[in-house]
Amino acid sequence: MAMSKIVSLTGLLASASLVAGHGYVSGVVIDGQYYGGYLVDKYAYSDNAPDTIGWTTSATDLGFVDGTGYQSPDIICHKDGAPGALTAEVAAGGKIELQWTEWPESHHGPVLNYLAPCGGECSAVDKTTLEFFKIEAKGLIDGTTPPGQWATDDLISNNNSYTVTIPTSIQEGNYVLRHEIIGLHSAGQKDGAQNYPQCINIKVTGGGDATPAGTAGEALYKDTDAGILFDIYSDLSGGYPIPGPEVFSA
């Protein structure tokens, strides 16, 4: 079979895997303490769901937001995202381990992390007023052989978890942490990229005086961005341009 046909078949199989279960952030660990997240496949159907630090969402299918939703509020903290009632405290410079329920191996792509100051209690914030600055991102790790090794592969190998460090220089206060996977397994075609944004409320303590400029959630991406419209089954020797704003550095 010709290589082009093999690559096409690989892409087709990856698209078919959409029926496979995606995951979500079920909880986080901060300084040894576990905080439960919003269990969308359970709490969305309950009249007595507990308060959590995780934002609620209507994405009970564990689905995604694609390029057609990049200018809608759904891209901010997933479909119909609404603030969690609780907030977890973390020291500036501290680490947050985000635990996913699962992640499909075929759904290769980057992992990105943003913060947005709430300007008050995050439980009452209007998500459309949030302005996000990127604090960390990982994309293509090894592109020797398509579809390559990606940040999602490392997440899977780390027991479906990802750890992000809060910058030491930012002002203390209440923030929304926007943690996101972008699945690129179908991104060779327009609106094929799949965004899975997950949001939690945190309070940063002991920080510095930095107030990084941010970007509204609906302005983070365009469906034609080089890191959004990207074929992972082609030659990857040129690397991968991580989409969105540049990572904040103090």
UniProtKB/Swiss-Prot annotation:
Thermal properties: Optimum temperature is 100 degrees Celsius.
Signal peptide stretch: 1-21
Record EC number: 1.14.99.-
Domain of life: Eukaryota
List of residues binding O2: H185, Q194
SS bond partners: C77-C199, C118-C122
Cofactor: Cu(2+)
Binding locations of Cu(2+): H22, H107, Y196
Class in the EC hierarchy, top level: oxidoreductase
GO CC entries: extracellular region
GO BP terms, alphabetized: lignin catabolic process
UniProt keyword list: Copper, Disulfide bond, Glycoprotein, Lignin degradation, Metal-binding, Monooxygenase, Oxidoreductase, Secreted, Signal
Compartments where located: Secreted
Bound cofactor: record note: Binds 1 copper ion per subunit.
Gene3D superfamilies noted in UniProt: 2.70.50.70
GO terms, molecular function: metal ion binding; monooxygenase activity
Main subcellular location of this protein, as a coarse class: secreted
pH dependence text: Optimum pH is 7.0.
Glycosylation sites (chain numbering): N159
InterPro entries in the cross-refs: AA9 (IPR049892), AA9_LPMO (IPR005103)
Family label: Belongs to the polysaccharide monooxygenase AA9 family.
Protein purpose: Lytic polysaccharide monooxygenase (LPMO) that exhibits oxidative cleavage beta-O-4 linkage of lignin resulting in the formation of aromatic compound guaiacol. Catalysis by LPMOs requires the reduction of the active-site copper from Cu(II) to Cu(I) by a reducing agent and H(2)O(2) or O(2) as a cosubstrate. Does not use cellulose, cello-oligosaccharides, xyloglucan, xylan, chitin nor starch as substrates. Able to depolymerize the lignin dimer guaicyl glycerol beta-guaicyl ether (GGE).
Descriptive protein name: AA9 family lytic polysaccharide monooxygenase AA17
